Amino acid sequence: MTSYSYFTIPSTATTGFNYPVQPMTMFSGAPYNAAMIPRKNRRERTTYSRQQLEILETLFNETQYPDVFARERVADQIRLQESRIQVWFKNRRAKYRLQEKQKPKRSNEKSQEHKSEDQQQTDVLDGEPLKGGSPGYQPQIKSELESCDGAVASGKLGTPKSISPVETTASTTSSNTSAAELQWNGDHKILGFGKNETTTSAAVSPTADNASTPSSSSSITATSSLPTTSSSLSVYNYPAIYPQWGLDYSTYANPQYAQFSHNPYAGTPFWYSNGNNL
């Protein structure tokens, strides 16, 4: 206390902290000790022998949910605890369900593999290159077959360039038949004024290109009887509009018509010699 002359002021000073304090404890005032914390039980992994697994799989094939009596009987047989048998069946059922879920995926993958193999085989048969193969590999099976079929359908198969005529008696019938099949009847059409188109065709002859030029009507008859080129020859025989001029038929592409140079077309003149019109 502080005293003055007239009054006394009480002291504000506090006494020291001198009473004992117990240490912090966790369990009823006992000091903290790590050994007093309850330890979590560790799971023990069980290793099964091959014989034990065979017995368990046999029972699982019979039933997935064995009763307690079956589990105890198997536990005595394989010398394990009944709780271990129960845990094994629980894990085995989970594995079985997972396998059942994966079955549709595997079946789909197998079907896709079969489809891809079939598609590759059809691509090879169609003449298309295999997937993943070299880009330069281009089989020509399909194109060759299509070209052959198209040629047969259109009748454009190539014919031999030279067919030697056979004059023997044994081959007369066959040669006449082939000539009759390849020969066409002459078709005369009138195209325009004074223009006659004569289309003639006959059998194929090896000497058609090198045929000699006939000079008389008898030689023309003999030549016409012989087979000529298979392609149709168009002859444009223009009559002499002005007979007094006289057209030179020997300059035509077909020399067999040279006879007409001696016998011009007997046409009627358009005017008389004195210059008067008709």
From Swiss-Prot:
It is found in: Nucleus; Chromosome, Telomere. GO terms for molecular function: DNA binding, bending; DNA-binding transcription factor activity, RNA polymerase II-specific; double-stranded telomeric DNA binding; RNA polymerase II cis-regulatory region sequence-specific DNA binding; telomeric DNA binding. Residues 98-182, 200-228 are annotated as: Disordered. Residues 41-100 bind DNA. It comes from Caenorhabditis elegans. Coiled coil: none annotated. GO terms for cellular component: chromosome, telomeric region; nucleus. Residues 98-118 have a biased composition (Basic and acidic residues). It comes from the Eukaryota. This is Homeobox protein ceh-37. The gene is ceh-37. Disulfide bonds: none annotated.
